[in-house]
Amino acid sequence: MQYGAHIYIFTDRWADDQLHLLDTMHGLGLDLAELSVGDDVHFTPAKTRQRAQELGLTLTVGPGGAWPLPCDLSADDPAERAAGLAWHQRQVDLAAELSAVAYAGALYGHPGVVKRRRPPAGEYAWTAEGLHALAEYAAVRNVRIVLEPMSHFRTHLVNTARQLMELIDLADHPNLWALFDTYHLITEERDYAAAIRTLAPRLWCVHTCENDRGAPGGGLVPWASLFDSLCEVGFDGPLVMEAYNSSIGAAPGDFAYSRGMFHNVCPDGAEFVRTGLEFLRSQVASRWHS
């Protein structure tokens, strides 16, 4: 089992002068660092790749930075879908430069775009077509494409495990994988164990945070059911904590507010990781190694 954390637990934007954070993450006992990329994120991939390799840290990337709205694989307009494919391909190129093992997120659409309408008959089909092309492009570069269902407050396209598997089946490519996010799906799935079983053939990663996006443990997430089912299906992929540091920004807390997090659940990134790791390891130790 690998344990990871999103870089947003420590900083609002990855850059060359943030390399020391990889040392911090390694020192906390993490095996994986998830970086956010986008049009406003600028760094030297070779420097990040080298430091991660020196530390033995696995890298993954996701599109958490600036992502133009007209770049959307699910858009009604074919030109926007083509622009979306080209944009994601550039992020895959960056992932390959980093030797990152995955490009992950709600890549099927554009997070934050929620179309309150009856879905057009062809929406899943044309989205699947774009995902197939992206998965093929990434496979040549040894980068997994990992798709994440999100809350209906963030997307109208894929809110449940069943919907994600339907889309993956339509896209029909072996380089498409699934990510289960305990925070996003607390409003979408009544039975986490059933959702894990649904995703099992493609499940690669689990984002592990509480229902308030705080450190895992003590909230509403049904952790016992989640970990029982993960053990049942033989999951051995990354468990990754994801949150927004609530002490950083132009003024302390500005970053979290800018990401829509209005309560102080991650004032100290290192403490967040320590608390979360202790909980996650205890859940794994009581099942996988019993």
Q: Where do the PLM segments sit?
A:
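Short loop/edge segments at beta-strand edges and connector loops
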Residues: 39, 147, 180
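Catalytic-core regions built around general acid/base machinery
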Residues: 46-56, 130-138, 195-198, 225-230
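Short, flexible loop segments at the rims of nucleotide/cofactor-binding pockets, characterized by
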Residues: 10-12, 37-38, 81, 123, ...
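Helix C-cap/helix->beta junction micro-motif
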Residues: 54-59, 98, 140-141, 174, ...
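Structural motif corresponding to the early beta-alpha repeats
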Residues: 31, 35-128, 240-250, 286
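Active-site acidic/histidine proton-transfer and metal-coordination neighborhood
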Residues: 77-177, 263, 267-271
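A short, flexible beta-alpha/helix-coil linker loop
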Residues: 10, 68-70, 110-113, 151-153, ...
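Histidine-acidic metal/acid-base catalytic patches
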Residues: 1-4, 9-11, 16-26, 99-101, ...
